[in-house]
């Protein structure tokens, strides 16, 4: 079993936690960096990919972005923005000497990849795996309200619409509607059979999520509300594997928009998967992940 190393990187006067699976070897295989979703979701679910370190003899790096998990802090709304999180990724690469790497990002992590490639133009990135991310907050909002919400019971649609109209995101009816929405399009298929790392209590970054994104998945009101990169996807020169689930918050239109816009990209639409394809379709996903990274090492 691969060696696990944990540590902290100083960042903006705070500490960013990281977890490394496996060791760097002179085998031509670049490490894989994992960018979690949220903002504020923690690295935990990426531990399902620990096996890739052994199966592919490759070092894997995951971390809790500032504001959540073992990097938790709150009371700092000035920190919850794209630049802080992208600078943190850049700092982590320098801190750990990850001059060459592959990067996988899920949900918000996929947004990070898109902005990182376009705005930072980083060197040494072998490939991207964009898992259920998106290039446009307005597209994500439209798909959430137009496509996903309209499959829900009318009383739940009414509760969501009332919250959006009034700005009051509280109450039993609203909470029940959001829970149903997330269960349909986000939560793991596996239920009680989910891996321990997916059920483990975690210190989510609630403040970073609300300040960065908004009160729920379909109402971006935070600092990322103007995240719009559709017209610039052609600037991404990094080979990109796009993955999404058939019942995903990342609708087929969102995923296809990325696949159409990013040169040298490939799209896999997973059946029996929601917003975390690498959990719901773990074994098949790992096969494709390993195949993709080896192609571009």
Language-model region placement:
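Conserved hydrolase catalytic core segment
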Residues: 99-143
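Active-site acidic short loop of glycosyltransferases
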Residues: 94-100, 122, 237-238, 264
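Conserved loop-alpha-helix segment in the C-terminal half of the alpha/beta-hydrolase fold
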Residues: 223-273
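Alpha/beta-hydrolase
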Residues: 148-151, 155-238, 257
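Catalytic active-site module of serine/aspartate enzymes centered on a nucleophile-bearing elbow/loop
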Residues: 264-297
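Conserved HGGG/HGGXW glycine-rich cap/lid loop of the alpha/beta-hydrolase fold
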Residues: 14-74, 78
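Active-site loop/oxyanion-hole signature of alpha/beta-hydrolase fold enzymes
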Residues: 61-108
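N-terminal cap/lid segment of alpha/beta-hydrolase-fold proteins
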Residues: 1-15
